[in-house]
Amino acid sequence: VKKTLSVFKLLFKWIFLVLGSFLFILLILSFTRIPYDVSAWLGKKSSRYTYKPDAIVFLGGSGMPSEANLIRLYYTSALAQKYPKAEIWIVHPKDTNVIADMRDELILHNVDSNRIHIEKLGTNTRDQALSLARDAHQLLFRKLVLVTSPENMLRSVKTFRKAGFRNVGGEAAFENAMFADLGFDYKKLGGRKYIPDVSSNLGLRYNFWNYLKLEINCLREFTAIAYYELNGWM
């Protein structure tokens, strides 16, 4: 019994050591721009295109309104204006209310309703690609541009190509930074003397947390990429 307990104690010790080291590395990286660069790489790698698309494919995966879907719809509507002859495809798991809201959002941004098509099947990227290939097989030989979050772009493009689509590019829905001085007068606002003054430390106030969130998104995506690779889906 003592030997078994000793083994478990050693095992837990190593687990906590590894997890602690991993979290420490994540915290250190959050003070650098590496998380942003990794996210940008995922959004741009394998997604470049030089053609005028025949179809713009919006890949949804959240409710409405939501940050993820609204920014993707923003990019989709911008592409729709840039390429007025392209069809618009909303690919989203079957939820008639959410899909209707997405369609209305595009129409609100001056996208002709006659250009909008719906694919309601598919609960993940692989399923969505196969469903679109089956239900709209004419798209297999046409020029596509996918719209999704930056972290999802690499996997999405490769998954659609694996599903048989010949020409697939992507437009990652990147957030744009706000270039404004967000510093403030700590004393003027009544800041207490024993509380640290971070009024001019934008890295700690914003960048650290944003990069920490990017790290989590990228880690989740690399896990998904590994899963798709092991299954031969991309």
Each PLM stretch: what is its role?
Residues 13-32:
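Hydrophobic membrane-insertion alpha-helices, especially the h-region
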Residues 37, 210-234:
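A transmembrane-helix-recognition feature enriched in membrane-embedded lipid enzymes
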Residues 28-204:
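A structural signal for short, hydrophobic/glycine-enriched beta-strand patches
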